Amino acid sequence: MIKLKVKKGDEVIVITGKHKGKKGKILKVFPEDSKVIVAGVNLVKKHTKPNQMSEGGIRTKELPIHISNIAHIDPKTGRPTKVVFKFLEDGSKVRVAKKSGEIIGKEGK
């Protein structure tokens, strides 16, 4: 299992595949599979039969995407960027956009 640099709520862009260029927020992270679910990306329609618990019908849901197919969006430029970890003067570890040096995530807001 590799160290993931993505967290729930991060803004990402799809860089390869049939959804290339789409942007969205990460809804869920699966570290054991190295996959994430991105809002509005990789949508599929699921046909369900009615049962006692729920109605039947066609439901749309997002499927996971491998983390190698996404990149963080630089908060300063709005373009795809790589992420590095840096330590601040107070000793806290933060994620930083490699191109602009901006802090990514909740730490930067």
Curated annotation (Swiss-Prot):
GO MF annotation terms: rRNA binding; structural constituent of ribosome
Coiled coil as UniProt keyword: no
A Pfam match: ribosomal_L24
Key words, A-Z: Ribonucleoprotein, Ribosomal protein, RNA-binding, rRNA-binding
A GO biological process held by the record: translation
GO cellular component: ribonucleoprotein complex; ribosome
Keyword Transcription regulation set for record: no
InterPro entries per UniProt: KOW, Rib_uL2_dom2, Ribosomal_uL24, Ribosomal_uL24_CS, Ribosomal_uL24_KOW, Translation_prot_SH3-like_sf
Task performed by this protein: One of two assembly initiator proteins, it binds directly to the 5'-end of the 23S rRNA, where it nucleates assembly of the 50S subunit.
Quaternary structure, from the entry: Part of the 50S ribosomal subunit.
The family this protein is said to belong to: Belongs to the universal ribosomal protein uL24 family.
Protein name per the record: Large ribosomal subunit protein uL24
Protein's organism: Rickettsia canadensis (strain McKiel)
Lineage: Bacteria, Pseudomonadati, Pseudomonadota, Alphaproteobacteria, Rickettsiales
Gene expressing this chain: rplX
